Amino acid sequence: MIQYVYLKHMRKLWSLGKVRSTVLRFSTTNRNASHLIKNELEQISPGIRQMLNSNSEFLEECSKYYTIAQGKQMRPSLVLLMSKATSLCHGIDRSVVGDKYIDDDDLRSFSTGQILPSQLRLAQITEMIHIASLLHDDVIDHANVRRGSPSSNVAFGNRRSILAGNFILARASTAMARLRNPQVTELLATVIADLVRGEFLQLKNTMDPSSLEIKQSNFDYYIEKSFLKTASLISKSCKASTILGQCSPTVATAAGEYGRCIGTAFQLMDDVLDYTSKDDTLGKAAGADLKLGLATAPVLFAWKKYPELGAMIVNRFNHPSDIQRARSLVECTDAIEQTITWAKEYIKKAKDSLLCLPDSPARKALFALADKVITRKK
């Protein structure tokens, strides 16, 4: 009954036009970063909702659900800022690069001088892939809350959530094809495959599920899984933005490396926040990783000091006392600090990768956003 009332209320707000998108929140010193792409970010959610229109209200309601309580929009922000930062790498006529192929009158008439309509569309596609992954993840993880509201699987059930996620990926694929850039299409298509591969790696949890000893391969396995589930989309969408802007292979590689490092650091800090934040701050359940039986970075670092964690990891913390015991072991070591240090190393690599770009407000914003990954609270 509560879910029905909530959805009815949100539909009323939608019809009255009172649902507003929120954009990535920057600290006071970094507000110029959001100002640089404010106009473009305001078009992300409306553009996505337009692409998700269908003749089925039943389908639209679920597929557009996560565009109502808007998230951080980190991924489209990165794509847009990267597009802006790399637009200074050469002097091509950006008013005629690839935009004639986008079948959207609103986008064709949109011009900033630095961000191409095709790059704006890429930012929307990137967020669509992310939203689809959230719909699927919440079913797999039996989530109850997302962005401070009932998760889609709770509001609509598992079947509708999975089908809505599939629908979003299909519409995103159509938008990719309309970019008429085979290299970009291939990059983003591999992201979708990476998301699935990452979920399968997570099912196994460690490289050798029977081993009770911590090995370097456990950390390597964790990083590979983190790339596939989180960093791949960020890395490849950043790289794709430079391809649409006809940048050099060197610049494209740098953009991809920045995205890879940002994405990996983001996942590391996500694992930290699972221990250090509360549900109402995160907008989702804290402590969920141990309940799902996942061996995240803090657990791996604690395992080095407390070998008994090996058996818990192998058994996916299925004993009634395992979760509380594992949490206590993590908290009485410097595992959290080690994870943060590891994330900071990736942030440094991310910033270093962009030193080949001309100094600009957009590049400074990318640096600021990188720092924000470490200091964020949710």
Curated annotation (Swiss-Prot):
GO molecular function term, any single one: metal ion binding
Location(s), subcellular: Mitochondrion
Pfam families: polyprenyl_synt
Entry keywords, A to Z: Isoprene biosynthesis, Magnesium, Metal-binding, Mitochondrion, Transferase, Ubiquinone biosynthesis
Gene Ontology cellular-component annotations: heterotetrameric polyprenyl diphosphate synthase complex; mitochondrion; polyprenyl diphosphate synthase complex
Protein name: Decaprenyl-diphosphate synthase subunit 1
Pathway per the UniProt entry: Cofactor biosynthesis; ubiquinone biosynthesis
Binding-site positions, Mg(2+) 2: 137, 141
PANTHER family tied to this protein: ALL TRANS-POLYPRENYL-DIPHOSPHATE SYNTHASE PDSS1 (PTHR12001:SF69), GERANYLGERANYL PYROPHOSPHATE SYNTHASE (PTHR12001)
Spans traversing the lipid bilayer: none
Binding site for isopentenyl diphosphate: 72, 75, 130, 147
Domain of life where this protein originates: Eukaryota
Signal peptide residues on this chain, from the entry's feature table: none
Record gene name: dps1
GO biological process terms, semicolon-separated: farnesyl diphosphate biosynthetic process, mevalonate pathway; isoprenoid biosynthetic process; ubiquinone biosynthetic process
Subunit composition and interactions: Heterotetramer of 2 dps1 and 2 dlp1 subunits.
Annotated Mg(2+) 1 binding sites: 137, 141
Keyword rRNA-binding: no
EC number: 2.5.1.91
UniProt cofactor(s): Mg(2+)
Group of enzyme by EC: transferase
Record-linked SUPFAM superfamilies: Terpenoid synthases
Cofactor note: Binds 2 Mg(2+) ions per subunit.
